[in-house]
Amino acid sequence: MWFDGGMRPRFFVYGAVVCVLALAGCSTVPPVIPIFGRPARIRDEGYSLLYSLADKQSNVGKILIIKKASAKVSAEIKEIAEVFGKAKERLDGFAKEDNGLSFKMSDLPSMEEKTRAAIESTTTKDLLFSSGKAFELRLLLTQVQALDYASHLANELADKEGNPKRKEFLTQFAKQCEEHHKTVVEMVGGG
């Protein structure tokens, strides 16, 4: 009989091992990115971030429909929106040319996404409920951050980009962002 002394402990041990293995299989483990797919995934994550930024920044000038700013600030904001609008169009073109290129891969941690959404909401409220010089300063400060981030992101993407056409675009876009960044910083400083 298997209930006699020898089989019972062994049956218990086997059962315990099966339970441990089953429970261990239930834990969530982040997916492992295959080595051959990792560069494309990193590239797509970068392009996703750049595309999202270009989409938002291409609309930055719309705030001037409901808020007043000086002619100098308004002109700069409209130029920035145009630069990002053209970048978004180019990115759309690249995606059409290469269906392997995806702009839907931000994969930011949940806390990062929530933090960014909270910052965006607060910034929008601050802009909408300010006026005059305070509004202009807040608006320009948002552009200092966006342009700095965009130029660095585009440069990082350009360093990793194997496609010469996209690499050239990213390099030029980064330079445009750097130029506008300098202009906006001067405007913030009273220049």
Residue positions per predicted region:
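Sec-dependent bacterial lipoprotein signal peptides
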Residues: M1-C26
